[in-house]
Amino acid sequence: MAKERKKIIRTRIGEREITNEGIIYFSRGLIGFDDKRDFALIQLSENSPFLLLQSLEDPALGLLVADPYSFMDDYEVRLSEAEKRILRVENVRQLAVLVTVTIPPGRPDETTLNLGGPIVINSEAKRGMQVPQVDSKYPTHFRPANDDPS
């Protein structure tokens, strides 16, 4: 059995060890970061719904993300056939959906989730893509504590 190659990456929260299996490739980058393609998901703490989507090319670029289903049950993401091909989707069970999180400094009660621009990851193919939801009922600044997206 082949041994997994490990690599140390620098992040805003210190050094972390990842395996090559943990690298997710974004062929189009992310909105605003089109030139960054390789990322890793880093768990911040064991029971937290939040993760860090860390660029492997830029240690200063780490986006706080969360599973939107931790905050709402009926969130839906639409993917075009072209997006499914880019993500190499064979089965929807391969997909994980994340949304970016903004926590204003010193004001955690004003935390917002970007439901209008989810990040979809094929966990088997290690491919990711940010998929803007055009004509969506979901806002880009959803406050989970007191918003209703509809």
Curated annotation (Swiss-Prot):
GO terms for biological process: bacterial-type flagellum assembly; regulation of translation. InterPro entries: Flagellar_assembly_factor_FliW, Flagellar_assmbl_FliW_dom_sf. Keywords: Bacterial flagellum biogenesis, Chaperone, Cytoplasm, Translation regulation. Residues 129-150 are annotated as: Disordered. Pfam families: FliW (PF02623). It comes from the Bacteria. It is found in: Cytoplasm. GO terms for cellular component: cytoplasm. Interacts with translational regulator CsrA and flagellin(s). Belongs to the FliW family. Acts as an anti-CsrA protein, binds CsrA and prevents it from repressing translation of its target genes, one of which is flagellin. Binds to flagellin and participates in the assembly of the flagellum. This is Flagellar assembly factor FliW.
